[in-house]
């Protein structure tokens, strides 16, 4: 916990200063590309420095999804969207899984291993495509991500459970969205396929860790 509370503010300050410095010497397309790389690098370093193996896996899968988004941008084709289901399958086989869903009156329905893999693969595979669709309206995806990570963080803090991975991912998500807000929440600029896919896996993976899948689904 101490590492998280030290590294995240330090990373936010460093990212802010680097953006201010590079903005003066770069053209806008170069500057936006630099900020995208800086965002991914900040997530990777945060996971390596202060995250657990689960957090590192989620960030790694998000980076992989962003590469698919880059290919999707370079060679547009509807078939790229089906590749995110492959990302979801990899996530389901090697990462955290959706083991149950909450029901009314505090009851839970637990999945069999096979159903758990299918549910997780669909959950993680759909979110990158969903955010890309939301990103067709400039600023929409960024604002909904901010709402989602805020609710994820609140749900984690007040759940009464020990959920360090969910807390770490939610805090990083909110902090990095804030410091790169002009890239995500700009009302006349889209995030793009790569960044949308990156955040889609992050928010889907974070919601799998805690008690907040229903919150994430309802928000988005």
Stretches with model-predicted labels:
Residues 54-89:
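Hydrophobic alpha-helical hairpins/lids featuring a short glycine-rich hinge
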Residues 106-118:
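Short aromatic-rich membrane-water interface segments that cap or initiate transmembrane helices
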Residues 74-76, 126-148, 197:
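Short acidic, Gly/Ser-rich segments with clustered Asp/Glu that frequently serve as metal-coordination loops
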Residues 71-72, 127-135, 180-189:
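Transmembrane alpha-helix interface/packing and boundary motifs in multi-pass membrane proteins
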Residues 45-55, 71-77, 92-108:
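Transmembrane alpha-helix boundary signature
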Residues 1-25, 35-67, 140-220:
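Alpha-helical transmembrane segments
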Residues 26-31, 74-77:
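Aspartate-rich (DDxxD/NDxxD/DxxxD) Mg2+/diphosphate-binding motifs
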Residues 63-67, 87-98, 119-129, 145-151:
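Membrane-embedded alpha-helical core segments of multi-pass
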